[in-house]
Amino acid sequence: MAEAEAEAAGAGAGAGPARRTTRVGRYELGKTIGEGSFAKVKVARDTRTGDTLAIKVLDRNHVLRHKMVEQIKREISTMKLIKHPNVVQLHEVMASKSKIYMVLEYVDGGELFDKIVNSGRLGEDEARRYFHQLINAVDYCHSRGVYHRDLKPENLLLDSHGALKVSDFGLSAFAPQTKEDGLLHTACGTPNYVAPEVLADKGYDGMAADVWSCGIILFVLMAGYLPFDDPNLMTLYKLICKAKVSCPHWFSSGAKKFIKRILDPNPCTRITIAQILEDDWFKKDYKPPLFEQGEDVSLDDVDAAFDCSEENLVAEKREKPESMNAFALISRSQGFNLGNLFEKEMMGMVKRETSFTSQCTPQEIMSKIEEACGPLGFNVRKQNYKMKLKGDKTGRKGYLSVATEVFEVAPSLHMVELRKTGGDTLEFHNFYNNFSSELKDIVWKSESDAKAAKKR
């Protein structure tokens, strides 16, 4: 999709590019924290309340060009009405001349996927606790006619209290929906988590397909690996369609029986959510979700976002903050311990996006990045102070691609952001471990960080 108008603009004068902020309505947009094929997600601040939110930026022309307006309006309207403790909340919808903005709850505890990467696998009780919350969310959305169709650990977020939040519910609007036979016909979703009937592309029930994905997630949480996996896509499809599940020895007998009922290749005999709620293994320590009585929700903003009238369009204003404010923000943010950042991330804490600081010039930084990418098998495209890195070999989920950008945060100090824009997250972890070792000499360390490093 085209670069969001909220994106930082061009190169600044002098040493390098300066980070710019953009106002969209009452929201001040920050850095990109996620990127997909049809949208970007940016962190944002509500200037009235000071609250931190996430804003999904969609290309308005893409929506209009593909005649998706009514589908998306229906799906977004449904999502705005959904208020569940385990589903990321949609607060508001706005539009400019070229973009649609979905204002979402900001979930700051990271992905459940990172917990698996760092721990290897979860204990049965902990995995069950997360599975309880996942089923609560899926059941609630299904009851309102909304299916996810791309459930995977990367779409399961954790808040600061460790509660599960499912993201991207309702985005099935971006693909063709139900046909005359009442079945869905679009094979979306990550291959390893997709149900056999979805791969067959003969139409499928959205509820049964989501249940299958939930079963794969539960297996991964408890085993630390996928039940069906192969680098060859056709072999992977065959494994999924046969659905011969081999559970590791540490699974309890109850867990084994339960997972096999979920990973039934026949959607007609596969366990339903109603039956899941009655299963003995599932019911252990289960607590039904508690709901607060929400206020009436207006859908006027959804209609206005798709209205071509000028009066309904939100204004976009670019502003440039002082460098010291940007530097202070970086220094004080959790996880941005400047000099120690690389060391921490090399110990396995790197996620789908990360950053580091350097006292080198932007030209030196970009030259060093390009130099490091060659031996790792990555092609590089440069534009101003942005770079697109793309692997020359296909991985489990296609080609690994990484976006990088250099910002000036203070005189003679620059921040480099890297984020995965395509491919497998585990492959990104492996790439980053090799990549970071090549860039050690350009990473800035404060005097106190350097002393601490010597002591270690």
UniProtKB/Swiss-Prot annotation:
Region (PPI), start-end ranges: 351-380
Q: Which UniProt keywords apply?
A: ATP-binding, Kinase, Manganese, Nucleotide-binding, Serine/threonine-protein kinase, Transferase
Q: Recorded E.C. number(s)?
A: 2.7.11.1
The top EC class, named as a word, is: transferase
Active site location = 150 (proton acceptor)
Any Pfam family matching the protein: NAF
Q: Where is this region: Activation loop?
A: 168-197
Tell me where in this chain the Protein kinase domain is found: 27-282
- The UniProt record lists the NAF domain at 318-343
The cofactors named for this UniProt entry are: Mn(2+)
- What GO biological process, any one, is recorded here? signal transduction
Q: Which residues bind ATP?
A: 33-41, 56
Swiss-Prot/TrEMBL catalytic activity: L-seryl-[protein] + ATP = O-phospho-L-seryl-[protein] + ADP + H(+); L-threonyl-[protein] + ATP = O-phospho-L-threonyl-[protein] + ADP + H(+)
Record flagged with keyword Manganese: yes
State the source organism's domain of life: Eukaryota
- Induction details: By drought and salt stresses.
InterPro entries cross-referenced by the UniProt entry: Kinase-like_dom_sf, NAF/FISL_domain, NAF_dom, Prot_kinase_dom, Protein_kinase_ATP_BS, Ser/Thr_kinase_AS
Offer an example of a GO molecular function term for this protein.
protein serine kinase activity
Which SMART domains does the entry link to? S_TKc
Under the heading CDD domains, the entry gives: CIPK_C, STKc_SnRK3
Keyword flag Transferase:
yes
The protein's job, in short, is: CIPK serine-threonine protein kinases interact with CBL proteins. Binding of a CBL protein to the regulatory NAF domain of CIPK protein lead to the activation of the kinase in a calcium-dependent manner.
Q: Which family does it belong to?
A: Belongs to the protein kinase superfamily. CAMK Ser/Thr protein kinase family. SNF1 subfamily.
Task: Fill in the domain comment.
Answer: The activation loop within the kinase domain is the target of phosphorylation/activation by upstream protein kinases. The PPI motif mediates the interaction with the ABI (abscisic acid-insensitive) phosphatases.
Please report the name of this protein according to its UniProt entry.
Answer: CBL-interacting protein kinase 9
UniProt lineage: Eukaryota, Viridiplantae, Streptophyta, Embryophyta, Tracheophyta
